[in-house]
Amino acid sequence: MKFTKDILIIDFEGLAEPVQIGAVLLDQETLIEKDYFSTYILADLKDKIKITSGISQETLKDAPAQAEVGQMIFEKFGTDIIIGSWVANADIKNFEKIIAAAGLDFKLYNYHILDIWPAAYIYLVKHGYSGSMQSEEIFKEFGAKPRGLHNALEDCRIAADVLRKIVL
C-alpha cells in the first residue's frame, strides 16, 4: 500500500495545555520510521503532577515554549505530510495551538487527518473483537505491552505499529 505522502504521527501529553509532544515520521510506502521528534513543552502545571505521565513542573522548567516547539516541528517535518494520531481530537487541537503560537497557519497542513484509533477498532471488530474501546485494551490486542506512565514518543510508536498491522 502506498499513501500519497509520508505520515507524521503525533501525540501529546496534557489536555488543557500540552506538556510533551512526540512525533514519528513514517515512509509513505513501507511505514518504516524515517525520523522522530520529542520534547517537553513549557507549561504551568500549578504544582500538580500529571498522573498518567508523571510529568511535573520540575520536568518542564527548562522546556521550550509552545512557539519554539511549533517552529521546531515545522522546520523538521514541513507541511507536505499526512498528519496522523491515535484519537486525534485533542492531539490536533494541541498541534494547532503550538503551530499558531509559532505564528504559522495550521491551514498550511492538509486538513485530512489520519485517525488511527477508529481504523484499529473497526479492524478488530471485523475480526471478532468484543472487548473495550479503551486504548490500552486495543493496544494489547495488537501485541503492545502495557504502557505504565504515558510517553508521547512511545505512544506514537505504538500507534505506528498498529497502523502497520492494519494496512500492511
Predicted regions and their residues:
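Active-site metal-coordination segments of metallo-dependent hydrolases
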Residues: G128, R147-L153
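Active-site catalytic microenvironments for nucleophilic, acid-base chemistry
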Residues: I98-A102, I122, E141, V162-I166
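Substrate-recognition/cap helix-loop segment adjacent to the acidic, metal-dependent catalytic center
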Residues: D91-L114
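Conserved non-catalytic scaffold segment of RNase H-like nuclease domains
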Residues: M1-K97, E136, K140-A144, H150
